[in-house]
Regions:
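Charged alpha-helical initiation segments
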Residues: 1-44, 59-63
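Long, charged low-complexity segments
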Residues: 1-13, 17, 64-160
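Structural signal for well-ordered, non-membrane alpha-helices
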Residues: 24, 28, 52, 144-151
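Conserved beta-strand->loop/alpha-helix structural units within folded catalytic cores of enzymes
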Residues: 46-57
Length: 160
């Protein structure tokens, strides 16, 4: 991960922290006040989706990143192995905590449904679509942890 990609990783972390905080607050209270907390989930969706996008972009070249724009599915497909396989497996494991039947087929179906969540939800009043906030949160959590580990490894190498 070069210096520019490390900066993108830092940006991804910032968007993740805001999105995760809002998600965790809203999920806790949405059953008691759905109208108020539904609208507070919108920034969580946008921030989590954007953090995933930026995280994926830390692992691919700039040309592919520009080509894929905000499409999470295309971005993930550009991430090389073994990172892509590790990410997919980790998200599946995390999602199984909510849905024991969640598998690789489910992963790709959910990713397809949420692939443009950033674009779909940043202007919700124009074209908000269905998004699975739990999937976005779990995926963002997994990828952010990989970005953090990669950054630490890079910093260790640079210190030598």
């Amino acid at each position: 991960m070069d210096r520019i990609m490390m900066k993108v990783g830092n940006e991804a972390l910032a968007f993740y922290e805001v999105g995760a905080r809002e998600y965790l607050t809203c999920i806790e209270h949405i059953a008691s006040d759905p109208e108020n907390y539904f609208y507070r989930l919108i920034p969580a969706i946008v921030n989590l989706a954007f953090s995933i996008e930026l995280s994926f972009k830390t692992f691919i070249n700039e040309v592919d990143a520009k080509k894929c724009r905000h499409d999470l599915q295309k971005l993930l497909e550009c991430v090389g192995n073994p990172i892509k396989d590790i990410l997919v497996e980790a998200v599946i494991t995390k999602m199984k905590q909510c849905d024991a039947a969640f598998n690789e087929e489910s992963f790709w179906a959910y990713l397809d449904q949420n692939k443009e969540a950033f674009e779909d939800w940043r202007y919700y009043y124009q074209r908000g679509k269905i998004a699975d906030i739990t999937f976005l949160y779990d995926m963002a959590t997994v990828i952010i942890n990989v970005v953090k580990r990669t950054k630490r490894a890079q910093e260790t190498i640079e210190q030598r």
